[in-house]
Amino acid sequence: MVFQSNVSADRIITLPTPKAGLTFRFASHNLTAADGHDIRFQISGGGTSLFFQGGITFLDTDNEISGIFTDNNSNDFLNIQVPVHYDITFVGSSATLYLVTGFVTSATAPSFSDAAA
């Protein structure tokens, strides 16, 4: 498990090529309100052959709750804008796929994409 505190700039966290059973969990810790910086998770090598599958729960700071899902075939970026808090788990399912689950609390919805947002 990796904890991330307040940071001084946007951060990119690059996951290695997926492998069955390889697991990473990332959570924020001690953020002050909305951190003011974005966090991007990406898969090393990326492209459409390595991707995320699954979804996360978005807890809007305006008290709305929604699900944010991958397209299940090509998204290799997870973009989290100005998080208040997050807890994300990635589990390698094969040599090309990470399953993703967790939640993000923010005023801005996170997004999965094929390129950095």
Where are these regions (language model features)?
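Exposed extracellular interaction/assembly regions and N-terminal maturation sites
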Residues: 1-64, 93-117
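Extracellular disulfide-bonded cysteine-rich modules/repeats
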Residues: 84-92
